[in-house]
Each structure stands twice: as structure tokens, then as C-alpha cells.
Design a protein with these regions (language model features):
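Non-globular targeting/processing and membrane-anchoring segments
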Residues: 1-68, 176-195
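Non-catalytic, surface beta->alpha helical segment in thiol-disulfide oxidoreductase systems
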Residues: 3, 131-195
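Short active-site neighborhood of thiol/selenol oxidoreductases, capturing the structured segment around
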Residues: 70-85
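Short, structured motif recognition centered on aromatic/hydrophobic residues
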Residues: 75-79, 94, 108, 134-141
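Conserved beta-strand elements of beta-rich interaction domains across eukaryotes
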Residues: 81-84, 113-116, 142-145, 153-154
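Short coil/turn segments at secondary-structure boundaries
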Residues: 89-92, 121-125, 150-153
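Thiol-based oxidoreductase modules, predominantly thioredoxin-like and allied folds used
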Residues: 103-121
Length: 195
């Protein structure tokens, strides 16, 4: 039979280990919009119905060059999951991007992949832990997918596995500085340089 004292010590030890080894929550101020429901996402993207949202996801990627970033509404969708370690470790990076690059026409949105499974399926994002596709970041220009990370291989149709998320490379890949500067209210002379 186990003594009460030994049980209390064991319980206390488990509690101390849980406190010491659990991940701290990221609690800094953030301009990233956390969407919790389909309705919020529809309002944010200015869509009328779920069908419109699924059509948006299935629409062909826009790969044509843009001429004027000042007139483009950019939405960066970050699909995350609480169980994916990579999402936990990269969350401060996405918040940093949101705080630095959010403007009136550039928005950063965080979506829980568990709540938006139909949308994940429509965007061809696997929520399986073995797929290593989370977090997936989609850049929408006027509600049409323009870029995604990790990118999908054109020949196989599968998303690549990402081991390291580097800040500089992601900023260049998504052209975040140019988008931010083009949509900020900084004066007409500087905006002409981005056309």
C-alpha cells in the first residue's frame, strides 16, 4: 500500500516539473488578428458566404506581376495548431511581422487549423502531424492566393518540409517591407518609387 506522504511528494514533484518544463505563453502586444469563427473570417475578407470562401481557396493562384502595390489589399493568413511544436516556436516571428508591417491595406490573420478544417482542405494544407505543413502562411492579394510558405512543389503537388524559418528570407519571400512602405501614408514622392 502507498503511503499518503509518498503520494503527496510525488504529486508535488509532478506539479513542479510541469511548471518548470511547460512552454511559456507568448504574451507581447500584437497587431495579428486572431480569427475564432467562420463569420469573423468572412467579415475580415469582405465575403458574403462560406461557398465564396471555399471558392477563394480553390481559385487558381495569381502568379502575374503586380504593377502597383499601393492599390492591392494584402492579407497574410497564418494557419497554426496548438499541438504543433513548430507553430509554437514560430509564433513570435509572425507577431513580429504583424507588429512591424501591418497597415490599412496589409493585415495579418491567425487561424487555428483545427477550427477551419474545410478551409485547410480547400487550400491543400494537411493538418496531419506527420505532414509538417503547419504553420502554413498564405499571402492573399485582393483575396486571391499569391504566395504560400511552405511552397507546393509544382511537379509533385506536395508541400515541402520546412526545418528552419529564417526572418530575413521570409521578409524577402513575401515582400513585406515593400508592401508595408507602399501602403503606408508616407507621401506621394516615396510611393512613386514602388510603382
Amino acid at each position: 500500500m502507498i503511503s499518503a506522504r509518498a503520494s503527496a511528494y510525488y504529486t508535488l514533484l509532478c506539479f513542479v516539473l510541469w511548471l518548470a518544463l511547460s512552454h511559456p505563453k507568448y504574451s507581447a502586444p500584437s497587431k495579428m488578428i486572431k480569427v475564432k469563427s467562420q463569420r469573423e473570417l468572412l467579415e475580415l475578407l469582405e465575403l458574403r458566404s462560406d461557398e465564396e470562401l471555399l471558392e477563394l481557396a480553390k481559385a487558381k493562384r495569381n502568379t502575374t506581376a503586380r504593377k502597383d502595390l499601393t492599390s492591392v489589399t494584402t492579407t497574410v493568413l497564418v494557419f497554426t495548431a496548438s499541438w504543433a511544436d513548430q507553430c509554437y516556436y514560430t509564433h513570435p516571428l509572425w507577431v513580429k511581422f504583424a507588429n512591424r508591417f501591418t497597415t490599412e491595406k496589409v493585415k495579418f490573420v491567425e487561424l487555428n487549423a483545427g477550427r477551419f478544417e474545410k478551409l485547410c482542405h480547400a487550400f491543400r494544407i494537411s493538418t496531419s502531424n506527420m505532414a509538417n505543413q503547419l504553420p502554413t502562411v498564405l499571402l492573399l492579394e485582393d483575396n486571391v492566393e499569391y504566395l504560400r510558405f511552405p511552397p507546393i512543389d509544382i511537379t509533385t503537388g506536395k508541400a515541402g518540409r520546412v526545418v528552419n524559418y529564417k526572418e530575413r528570407e521570409l521578409m524577402k519571400y513575401f515582400e513585406l517591407e515593400g508592401r508595408c512602405l507602399a501602403t503606408q501614408d508616407i507621401g506621394i514622392e516615396k510611393k512613386k518609387a514602388f510603382r
